[in-house]
Amino acid sequence: MADVLTGKGFLVTTSLAAGLTAGASEIITVIGLSVANVHATVDSWVTVDVNRDGGVDSELGHQVNIPVNDSLDMLNGGKIVLNNSDTLDFIAENASSIEASISYLVQT
């Protein structure tokens, strides 16, 4: 089994979209998940969902308000495991306001 520690940024839009997807032969452990409001004048909420392929979906946060120029650690030191074909989905109140930073371990 190979282990790769990596990360990515994701621009959250007003349409629900996967910011991270576990491949068919992958297990992903999300070890860091921050969302930031980068807009200069407008507060915005964000919803973060864990979509389980063949399991029970869950929300990490539902319409959590992020003030202008502020950020939130969605995991508070915890971890989330994505099994094959699971996704980490995001949607925001306003376009071009919320950015996510995701750090994770991929095991194949």
Label every model-predicted segment:
Residues 1-28, 32, 91-108:
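C-terminal interaction-tip segments
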